[in-house]
Design a protein with these regions (language model features):
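Conserved glycine-rich FAD pyrophosphate-binding loop
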Residues: 19-151
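A conserved active-site cap/scaffold subdomain adjacent to cofactor or substrate pockets
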Residues: 1-23
Length: 151
């Protein structure tokens, strides 16, 4: 019976041919790049795979584009920076942090950055991060204040 069915290699070759013919990969990367570089407001989200429906709902008032990779626990959002952007981001970040996730502000207009910390709250390992930074940069000359917690 097994001899009568196509081999796994043959099935994979056919699948590969179908995917290439559909140009799905090009569309995937085009969408990914559009979201990662589009608009003055860009955020990176980390969440449990089951949490992306809520993330989508929390960030929808921003009116931008989203791309979620739930199996990776990673997502990106971008778009305009409407007036309530800082409060929407703060609410979304609070919900994510309570569930073990995070929201990092990758780009935003100055008025949004002034109202929300780009990195969010320092992690529990912050003391260790501080000691490592102090060991490698005792004079604090390398990018001072540009990382989480002002590192």
């Amino acid at each position: 019976m097994l001899n009568e069915s196509p081999s796994i290699e043959e099935q994979l070759a056919r699948l590969d041919k179908m995917v290439k013919a559909s140009r799905a990969e090009e569309g995937f990367w085009a969408r990914h790049d559009q979201v990662r570089t589009g608009g003055p407001l860009r955020v990176k989200v980390a969440a449990l795979p089951t949490g992306f429906a809520e993330v989508d709902e929390l960030l929808s008032p921003l009116g931008g584009a989203f791309v979620w990779y739930p199996s990776l626990g990673l997502g990106f959002a971008s778009g305009p920076a409407p007036d309530p952007a800082a409060s929407v981001l703060a609410d979304a970040r609070g919900a994510l942090v309570r569930r073990g996730g995070s929201l990092v502000l990758q780009a935003a207009p100055p008025e949004v950055r002034a109202r929300i910390d780009p990195w969010g709250p320092p992690p529990p390992s912050f003391a260790l991060l501080r000691r490592v930074k102090d060991n490698f940069d005792p004079d604090h000359r390398l990018n001072p204040g540009r990382f989480v917690g002002g590192l």
